[in-house]
C-alpha cells in the first residue's frame, strides 16, 4: 500500500513537471514571437509612408557601423514574382536608394525572366530602367520608348506606401524560427484574402490564383536591432516545384555608400 502511494506520488510529480516544462516552452515561443514582432514593428510602424521624401528627415536605427557624420541611406524594395506551370519566373522589381546626406534618391526598375533550359541550364533575360524620385514621383532617368513601361514606372507605388500593419500584434499562431548563431529569425502567419494588405496587393497586381497567402517576416542580424541586418516581408501565394507566386518588400536603413 505504501509502495502504491509512493508510486502514485512519483507519477503525479512527473506529470506536474512535464506540464510545467511544456508551459515553459510555450511561454518561450510566445516570448520569442513577441520579440520578433517588436523588432519588425520598428520598421512596419512607419507604414504607410504616403510621402517617401519624409524619410529624408527620419533617422533609422544606428550602430557602430555608421560614421558619426553619416546621416544614412534608406533602401526600399518591392517586387512581384510569378511563375506559372511550364513557364519561367517573371519578376518586376523596383529598388530605391534615398540618401539623407544629399537628400537625393536614385534607383532602378527591373524586369527579369528566368527560364530553365534542358541544354544550357538557366537562361536569364533582364531589362533595367534607371529612375529618380522628385516631388514624391518616379521619373525615368533615361528616355523610355515603351509607353506602357514608362507609365508603369511613373505610377509605381512601393508596398510601404500603402501597406498597413497596425494589427500586427493581433496575428496569432505564428511559426517562429530563431537562430542566434547566424543570427536570423522569422515568423510565418496564414492570412485570408480578406486581409487588408492582401487586398491591396491583389488590387495592384494580377495574381493568378485565388489561394490566400502566407505572410513571412524574415530578419537577419541582432534581434534587438542592427543597422547591418535586414528585414524582409514576403507574401507567398503559391510555393511548389515549377510554380511560384510571391510578393516581397523591404525597407532598410543602411550606412551611406551602399547605394552604388
Curated annotation (Swiss-Prot):
It is a lipid-anchor. It is found in: Cell membrane. The keyword Nucleus does not apply. Keywords: Cell membrane, Lipoprotein, Membrane, Palmitate, Signal. The keyword Signal applies. Gene3D superfamilies: 2.50.20.40. It comes from the Bacteria. A lipid is attached at residue 23 (N-palmitoyl cysteine). A lipid is attached at residue 23 (S-diacylglycerol cysteine). Residues 1-22 form the signal peptide. Pfam families: DUF576 (PF04507). GO terms for cellular component: plasma membrane. Belongs to the staphylococcal tandem lipoprotein family. This is Uncharacterized lipoprotein SERP2451. It comes from Staphylococcus epidermidis (strain ATCC 35984 / DSM 28319 / BCRC 17069 / CCUG 31568 / BM 3577 / RP62A).
Amino acid at each position: 500500500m505504501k509502495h502504491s502511494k509512493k508510486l502514485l506520488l512519483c507519477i503525479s510529480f512527473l506529470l506536474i513537471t512535464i506540464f510545467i516544462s511544456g508551459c515553459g516552452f510555450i511561454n518561450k515561443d510566445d516570448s520569442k514571437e513577441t520579440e520578433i514582432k517588436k523588432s519588425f514593428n520598428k520598421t512596419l510602424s512607419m507604414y504607410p509612408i504616403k510621402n517617401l521624401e519624409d524619410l529624408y528627415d527620419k533617422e533609422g536605427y544606428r550602430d557602430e557601423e555608421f560614421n558619426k557624420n553619416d546621416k544614412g541611406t534608406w533602401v526600399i524594395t518591392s517586387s512581384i514574382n510569378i511563375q506559372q506551370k511550364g513557364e519561367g519566373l517573371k519578376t518586376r522589381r523596383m529598388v530605391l536608394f534615398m540618401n539623407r546626406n544629399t537628400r537625393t534618391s536614385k534607383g532602378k526598375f527591373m524586369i527579369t525572366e528566368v527560364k530553365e533550359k534542358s541544354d544550357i541550364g538557366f537562361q536569364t533575360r533582364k531589362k533595367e530602367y534607371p529612375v529618380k524620385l522628385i516631388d514624391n514621383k518616379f521619373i525615368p532617368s533615361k528616355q523610355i520608348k515603351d509607353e506602357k513601361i514608362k507609365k508603369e514606372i511613373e505610377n509605381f507605388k512601393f508596398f510601404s506606401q500603402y501597406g498597413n500593419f497596425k494589427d500586427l500584434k493581433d496575428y496569432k499562431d505564428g511559426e517562429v524560427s530563431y537562430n542566434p548563431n547566424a543570427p536570423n529569425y522569422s515568423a510565418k502567419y496564414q492570412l485570408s484574402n480578406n486581409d487588408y494588405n492582401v487586398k491591396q496587393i491583389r488590387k495592384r497586381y494580377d495574381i493568378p490564383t485565388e489561394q490566400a497567402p502566407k505572410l513571412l517576416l524574415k530578419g537577419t542580424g541582432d534581434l534587438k536591432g542592427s543597422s547591418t541586418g535586414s528585414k524582409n516581408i514576403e507574401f507567398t501565394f503559391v510555393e511548389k516545384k515549377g510554380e511560384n507566386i510571391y510578393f516581397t518588400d523591404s525597407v532598410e536603413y543602411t550606412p551611406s555608400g551602399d547605394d552604388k
